[in-house]
Amino acid sequence: YANGVKEMVLAGMLLASRDIVGGIEWLKSQEPADDLAKKAEKEKKKFAGCEISGKKLGIIGLGAIGVKVANAAVHLGMEVYGYDPFISVDAAWSLSRNIHHINEVSEIYRDCDYITIHVPLLESTKKMIGREEIAQMKDGVVLLNFARDLLVDEEALCKALEEGKVKKYVTDFANPVVANAPNTLVTPHLGASTEESEDNCAVMAVQQVMDYLENGNIKNSVNYPDCDAGRCVDAGRITINHKNVPNMISQFTKTLGDAGVNIANMTNKSKGDRSEEHTSELQ
């Protein structure tokens, strides 16, 4: 579904830059007449905007979607800045060399004309875009949120929209606060609503469930970390899902040792209060 969301983000930037929606609504409001084309030529200046080519785009979160947005924006002539302190090796290899990978998110707030968020919703990221962050942004910034609804402090956002600090807010999450707020473009969660995305998601879900059942590997879980020990081709493998508390690993290894089982390889990953343990090549 990453490509479907990427296309929505690009569409959102274009719609926020040029008042295409306003122009369409104006045209539909006009009575059919022979001089409609002439009238449109006269009124079109009301809907003028700017091009995104040459503008600075800041991307917070360089996962599957963030990387696709970054690479596509480069091809559209944008100057792209990416921030992700936890970027994966695969994502890093997929990024265009023309993308500036920065170490402080404040640089994005300070310098970028467009800012798009692509991070998971955690306690640490809830309302990550608030009054202080918005205050650091350029006047007239365009903010896009196609990740999670609660990443943005909407009270602070609405105030910034009214004051003109934020030029446009584009989001895929409809709620009563932003749906009728000024200078917002709100879509009804259409990011992955394409035939291709739905097919790809179904195939991906089946493949990842099979990988877990056959190999114990976890990918794209909501409450567990990605944990990949490859295919299970050894004598055996034990996968243990457990609470992320001290001394758990020592208990597992002692239990196996007492049973006369030797562990040749072991992988442990944690996410929040949950962990997964792989022990493989049991002897």
Task: State what each model feature region is.
Residues 55, 62-63:
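Glycine-rich Rossmann-fold phosphate-binding loop(s) that bind the pyrophosphate
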Residues 66-67:
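N-terminal Rossmann-fold NAD(P) dinucleotide-binding loop
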Residues 6-25, 73-78, 203-217, 253-257:
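Oxidoreductase and adenylate-handling cofactor-binding alpha/beta cores
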Residues 219-281:
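A conserved regulatory-domain signal marking ACT and ACT-like small-molecule sensing domains
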Residues 85-177, 193:
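Rossmann-like adenosine-cofactor binding region
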Residues 1-56, 220:
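Phosphate-binding beta-alpha-beta segment of Rossmann-like dinucleotide-binding domains, i.e.
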Residues 167, 179-221:
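Adenosine-phosphate binding glycine-rich loop
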Residues 72-73, 137:
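Aromatic pocket-lining residues of Rossmann-like dinucleotide-binding sites
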